[in-house]
Amino acid sequence: GGSSNSAAASTSTAASSTAASAAGDATAAANDPKVTLVYAEVNPLDTIVGQTATHFKEKVEELTGGSVVIDVQASGVLGSENDVLDAILGGSTSIDMSRISAFALTSYGCNKSKLLSIPFTFENRAHFWNFANSDLAPEFLNEPQELGLPVRGIFYGEEGFRHFFTVKPVSGIADFKGLKLRV
């Protein structure tokens, strides 16, 4: 079968809860100068997004001299993306940040995020990263806060591109007419 190189990017953002206590309880912070933040990830650590979480943890701890510790909870042990976001929205202080896919954010009214999940939005990885590093990208990262959600997008991640395998060649969106898709 054929496959399309102009596939849809599966994008995600790391979302940090602005409602969660940044330094935890004030008394605890005074007694322990370290701040531990819980990072929820639905995928295992050996995936690209799991590796991104690990890299984020290492960089934060390095750049803060260890005063901020990131506790990565992977493999969905804290729930699905929607479970995690619901917990954050409900005021949970047990989760401080999570990687949330652009598609998952659409369930919470983030309509700009839908654009990031449409097939053929990006021609290739370079095209996606040109967008992610552009002046337009913050509009998407800031959308949850603009809608009043207590989360902040802090970076883009790329989970890879979707590839479509078919009996007939696919070179553009029109070629999908009549095809059944399974994801």
Where do the protein language model's features map onto the residues?
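Short, low-complexity disordered leader/linker segments with a strong preference
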Residues: 1-36
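Short, polar/charged alpha-helical segment
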Residues: 24, 46-71, 135
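Conserved N-terminal glycine/acidic-rich loop preference
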Residues: 30-32, 49-52, 79-87, 94-97
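Residues at or immediately flanking beta-strands
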Residues: 36, 67-71, 180
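Extracytoplasmic "Venus flytrap"
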Residues: 38-54, 75-79
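Contiguous mixed-secondary-structure segments that line small-molecule binding/active-site clefts
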Residues: 58-61, 91-94, 101-183
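Surface-exposed patches in mature extracellular/periplasmic domains of secreted proteins
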Residues: 70-75, 100
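Short helix-initiation/N-cap motifs at beta->coil->alpha
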Residues: 73-86, 170-171, 183
